[in-house]
Each structure stands twice: as C-alpha cells, then as structure tokens.
C-alpha cells in the first residue's frame, strides 16, 4: 500500500492563528474563558481546549458579565460586539483576517445603499456573521439553480461577496450569470486562497491514486468541498479520525491519497497515516 499526502492539507493560516490565540488565552486563565460557538469545526481539537478549561457556549447571554469571550475564526455579526461591550466582556477576537475583510466590504457597501449578495450556506456560522454586517438583509445564494430562480431589481445596486470556503468553480458560474442579469454589481472574490490551493492540490492527488481519504469535521464546509472534489474522480472516504477507517475496504486499494480540511490538526493526520502504514 502506497500512501500519498496532498501538498496542502490541514490547518490554514486563519485556523492556526485562531487556535494559537485561544490556547494562549486558556493558558493564562484557569477559569472564565468562554468561546462563542466551537472554536473550529473539529470536535477532537476543540476537546483539547475544553480539557484546559475553555467553555463553549452558543449564546452570548449565557456568558457572565466581566468574563473573557473568544470570538472564533468564522467571525460574528456586528451586534455581538455591542452586546459584549454592554456586558463588559474582554474580547479575544480570533476572526480570520480574510473574513474580517468581508465584514468591512459588506458594511461599507451596505452603508452606501447597495444590496448585498453572499454566495454561501446561510446556516454556516461564517455566512451568519457576514449577514450580520448588513443588518441581516443579504441575499444568500448556495447553488446556481437557486440563483437562476431568483428575481432581481435592476434599479438597485448590488455588491457580491463569497463565503471563504466555497468552490471556486461555483463562484465563477454564479458571477457569470449575475453579470448578464444585473446592470450594476460589484464583484468581490473573497474565496480564501488556501481554499483554492487545497482543492487544487486534492484534485491533482486524486488523479494519481486509487482512492482518497479526506480527514475533517463533519460540519466543516471546506472539508465537504474537498470530499466533493475528490469523489468526482475516485472513490472517496470522509472521516474525522482513524477509528472510522474500514480496513477491509481500504485493503482493496494499492495507492491511497490523503487530504484534510482547514480545521484538521496535524496530529490527527499523522494518526491516520501511521494507522495505514501498519496495515
């Protein structure tokens, strides 16, 4: 069995930065550290922080006044900052700088009177956060088919941004269609370069192997995009840890490729590789 790992796999810049900032904060405080939502979409990595005392909550109302609150890398709506100030919380803002840039663009164009269009999943925390910078008024498009069934007002001006982890091909297809539909629209390609690179690297590796293993959280958007890219080319197995590997199935393949989502720590990737090498 030959094992190859994609050139670009695992933690991206934004996640590395967020995890280090959060770890430094947890190390400094024995108690009273709260994360508003899971730090990243990887429950194994988050568990290590919770063992050190981090408390994950879903609502800011559940955080006591004067405590420390970590804003995760996905970012949050604008109103969260005001609520945190009212509660006198100390904010540790680990929002990815690329996501912060989207917040700035959306806020700026919304204040100029533009309608905001977001390409992404309305249920994803990053998109929820982005929408919160235009008073939750964004038009959110997840698929090309959805967009084709929408009606737009050509008397209005539009500004488009994208969830950082969407498929670049989806972005291009929607942009091309909207270019024909709308007279005045500003396009902002806000897909993270790490997302593009990771997907391209996974695609190249998938062409060289008999099957792919994609490691990442079940709720991780970028991991699911990697799965889609790979399964279009070869049999693909999506897992969170080595314990989910089906040994009997994998033994059928001679050349295995491995990639991992942006929220997957190196130690989980290494565990999978070691497990496969010992088969």
From Swiss-Prot:
<dbReference type="Pfam" id="PF02401">
    <property type="entry name" value="LYTB"/>
</dbReference>
<dbReference type="GO" id="GO:0050992">
    <property type="term" value="P:dimethylallyl diphosphate biosynthetic process"/>
</dbReference>
<dbReference type="GO" id="GO:0046872">
    <property type="term" value="F:metal ion binding"/>
</dbReference>
<feature type="binding site">
    <location>
        <position position="74"/>
    </location>
    <ligand>
        <name>dimethylallyl diphosphate</name>
    </ligand>
</feature>
<feature type="binding site">
    <location>
        <position position="96"/>
    </location>
    <ligand>
        <name>[4Fe-4S] cluster</name>
    </ligand>
</feature>
<feature type="binding site">
    <location>
        <position position="164"/>
    </location>
    <ligand>
        <name>(2E)-4-hydroxy-3-methylbut-2-enyl diphosphate</name>
    </ligand>
</feature>
<feature type="binding site">
    <location>
        <position position="124"/>
    </location>
    <ligand>
        <name>dimethylallyl diphosphate</name>
    </ligand>
</feature>
<comment type="pathway">
    <text>Isoprenoid biosynthesis; isopentenyl diphosphate biosynthesis via DXP pathway; isopentenyl diphosphate from 1-deoxy-D-xylulose 5-phosphate: step 6/6.</text>
</comment>
<feature type="binding site">
    <location>
        <position position="74"/>
    </location>
    <ligand>
        <name>isopentenyl diphosphate</name>
    </ligand>
</feature>
<feature type="binding site">
    <location>
        <position position="221"/>
    </location>
    <ligand>
        <name>isopentenyl diphosphate</name>
    </ligand>
</feature>
<feature type="binding site">
    <location>
        <position position="74"/>
    </location>
    <ligand>
        <name>(2E)-4-hydroxy-3-methylbut-2-enyl diphosphate</name>
    </ligand>
</feature>
<feature type="binding site">
    <location>
        <position position="220"/>
    </location>
    <ligand>
        <name>(2E)-4-hydroxy-3-methylbut-2-enyl diphosphate</name>
    </ligand>
</feature>
<feature type="binding site">
    <location>
        <position position="263"/>
    </location>
    <ligand>
        <name>dimethylallyl diphosphate</name>
    </ligand>
</feature>
<feature type="binding site">
    <location>
        <position position="41"/>
    </location>
    <ligand>
        <name>dimethylallyl diphosphate</name>
    </ligand>
</feature>
<protein>
    <recommendedName>
        <fullName>4-hydroxy-3-methylbut-2-enyl diphosphate reductase</fullName>
        <ecNumber>1.17.7.4</ecNumber>
    </recommendedName>
</protein>
<comment type="similarity">
    <text>Belongs to the IspH family.</text>
</comment>
<keyword id="KW-0479">Metal-binding</keyword>
<feature type="binding site">
    <location>
        <position position="263"/>
    </location>
    <ligand>
        <name>isopentenyl diphosphate</name>
    </ligand>
</feature>
<feature type="binding site">
    <location>
        <position position="124"/>
    </location>
    <ligand>
        <name>isopentenyl diphosphate</name>
    </ligand>
</feature>
<feature type="binding site">
    <location>
        <position position="222"/>
    </location>
    <ligand>
        <name>isopentenyl diphosphate</name>
    </ligand>
</feature>
<feature type="binding site">
    <location>
        <position position="222"/>
    </location>
    <ligand>
        <name>(2E)-4-hydroxy-3-methylbut-2-enyl diphosphate</name>
    </ligand>
</feature>
<feature type="binding site">
    <location>
        <position position="192"/>
    </location>
    <ligand>
        <name>[4Fe-4S] cluster</name>
    </ligand>
</feature>
<feature type="binding site">
    <location>
        <position position="222"/>
    </location>
    <ligand>
        <name>dimethylallyl diphosphate</name>
    </ligand>
</feature>
<dbReference type="InterPro" id="IPR003451">
    <property type="entry name" value="LytB/IspH"/>
</dbReference>
<keyword id="KW-0414">Isoprene biosynthesis</keyword>
<keyword id="KW-0560">Oxidoreductase</keyword>
<keyword id="KW-0411">Iron-sulfur</keyword>
<feature type="binding site">
    <location>
        <position position="220"/>
    </location>
    <ligand>
        <name>dimethylallyl diphosphate</name>
    </ligand>
</feature>
<feature type="binding site">
    <location>
        <position position="221"/>
    </location>
    <ligand>
        <name>(2E)-4-hydroxy-3-methylbut-2-enyl diphosphate</name>
    </ligand>
</feature>
<feature type="binding site">
    <location>
        <position position="12"/>
    </location>
    <ligand>
        <name>[4Fe-4S] cluster</name>
    </ligand>
</feature>
<feature type="binding site">
    <location>
        <position position="263"/>
    </location>
    <ligand>
        <name>(2E)-4-hydroxy-3-methylbut-2-enyl diphosphate</name>
    </ligand>
</feature>
<feature type="binding site">
    <location>
        <position position="41"/>
    </location>
    <ligand>
        <name>isopentenyl diphosphate</name>
    </ligand>
</feature>
<dbReference type="GO" id="GO:0016114">
    <property type="term" value="P:terpenoid biosynthetic process"/>
</dbReference>
<feature type="active site" description="Proton donor">
    <location>
        <position position="126"/>
    </location>
</feature>
<dbReference type="GO" id="GO:0051745">
    <property type="term" value="F:4-hydroxy-3-methylbut-2-enyl diphosphate reductase activity"/>
</dbReference>
<feature type="binding site">
    <location>
        <position position="124"/>
    </location>
    <ligand>
        <name>(2E)-4-hydroxy-3-methylbut-2-enyl diphosphate</name>
    </ligand>
</feature>
<keyword id="KW-0408">Iron</keyword>
<dbReference type="GO" id="GO:0019288">
    <property type="term" value="P:isopentenyl diphosphate biosynthetic process, methylerythritol 4-phosphate pathway"/>
</dbReference>
<dbReference type="GO" id="GO:0051539">
    <property type="term" value="F:4 iron, 4 sulfur cluster binding"/>
</dbReference>
<feature type="binding site">
    <location>
        <position position="221"/>
    </location>
    <ligand>
        <name>dimethylallyl diphosphate</name>
    </ligand>
</feature>
<keyword id="KW-0004">4Fe-4S</keyword>
<comment type="pathway">
    <text>Isoprenoid biosynthesis; dimethylallyl diphosphate biosynthesis; dimethylallyl diphosphate from (2E)-4-hydroxy-3-methylbutenyl diphosphate: step 1/1.</text>
</comment>
